[in-house]
């Protein structure tokens, strides 16, 4: 007899449980007197909650650097004291999620929540950049299922679209929910999602950022460690 397929709800529950498992492990990486980059997104939010428990229960002395208004609110709710990037001097570790991770290179795509510019600044500035995900996010080739988000200055959106079409990419302006019109980032800019062939992630990252009007793109190539939640355990992958 064939094994019955899981419903979408069951798959979602499994994914959520793996994210929680990974978030708990990531919280154990944080030590007293660390400055911690706080990523954005569902997995990063779970990490922030778990870290907040340690701050309260163990009186862990740390500061967090948020990467979005959303992560700022979650940190405030979780009891994590915050510090700005220009105040902290350096960031010991940044913990963030991902939308897609290349199995071979650990290059990744982020930005489903439209926060990738601030995330990349904090993640790249940190001494160590750790990514959290469940095993469904691992892919053989980056960009298989997920478009690369570009944060674009509104003044230049039409010229950016034209340039992307000329290089055989497939761009689309991201629309908002709860309001008419495009998504507007925390920085006041637009998001263009683009499907593009990624043979070399570093080259594509640099090329997209060279387009006038593009503030930052969602390809990240400087991950140091990946924590992957599986049904059996949390796997720690290093370059």
From Swiss-Prot:
InterPro entries: NagB/RpiA_transferase-like, Ribose5P_isomerase_typA_subgr, Ribose5P_isomerase_type_A. Gene3D superfamilies: 3.30.70.260, 3.40.50.1360. It is an enzyme of class 5 (isomerase). Coiled coil: none annotated. GO terms for cellular component: cytosol. Pathway: Carbohydrate degradation; pentose phosphate pathway; D-ribose 5-phosphate from D-ribulose 5-phosphate (non-oxidative stage): step 1/1. The keyword Iron does not apply. Substrate binds at residues 40-43, 96-99, 110-113, 137. Keywords: Isomerase. One of its GO terms (biological process) is pentose-phosphate shunt, non-oxidative branch. GO terms for molecular function: ribose-5-phosphate isomerase activity. Its EC number is 5.3.1.6. The active site is at 119 (proton acceptor). Catalyzes the reversible conversion of ribose-5-phosphate to ribulose 5-phosphate. PANTHER family: RIBOSE-5-PHOSPHATE ISOMERASE. Belongs to the ribose 5-phosphate isomerase family. NCBIfam families: PRK00702.1, rpiA. Homodimer. This is Ribose-5-phosphate isomerase A. It comes from Methanococcus vannielii (strain ATCC 35089 / DSM 1224 / JCM 13029 / OCM 148 / SB). The lineage of its organism: Archaea, Methanobacteriati, Methanobacteriota, Methanomada group, Methanococci. The gene is rpiA.
């Amino acid at each position: 007899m064939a094994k019955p397929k899981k419903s979408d709800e069951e798959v979602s529950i499994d994914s959520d449980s793996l994210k929680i498992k990974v978030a708990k492990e990531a919280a154990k990486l944080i030590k007293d007197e660390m400055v911690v980059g706080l990523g954005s997104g569902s997995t990063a939010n779970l990490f922030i909650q778990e870290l907040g428990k340690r701050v309260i229960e163990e009186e862990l002395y740390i500061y967090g650097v948020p990467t979005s208004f959303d992560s700022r609110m979650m940190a405030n709710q979780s009891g994590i004291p915050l510090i700005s990037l220009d105040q902290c001097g350096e960031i010991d570790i940044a913990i963030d999620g991902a939308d897609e991770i290349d199995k071979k290179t650990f290059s990744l795509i982020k930005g489903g929540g439209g926060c990738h510019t601030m995330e990349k600044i904090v993640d790249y500035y940190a001494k160590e950049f750790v990514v959290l995900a469940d095993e469904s996010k691992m892919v053989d080739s980056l960009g298989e299922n997920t478009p690369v988000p570009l944060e674009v200055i509104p003044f230049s959106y039409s010229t950016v679209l034209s340039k992307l079409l000329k290089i055989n990419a497939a761009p689309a302006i991201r629309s908002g929910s709860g309001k008419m019109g495009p998504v507007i980032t925390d920085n006041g800019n637009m998001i263009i999602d683009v499907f593009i062939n990624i043979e070399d992630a570093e080259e594509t990252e640099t090329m997209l950022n060279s387009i006038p009007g593009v503030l930052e793109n969602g390809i990240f190539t400087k991950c140091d460690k990946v924590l992957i939640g599986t049904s059996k355990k949390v796997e720690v992958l290093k370059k």
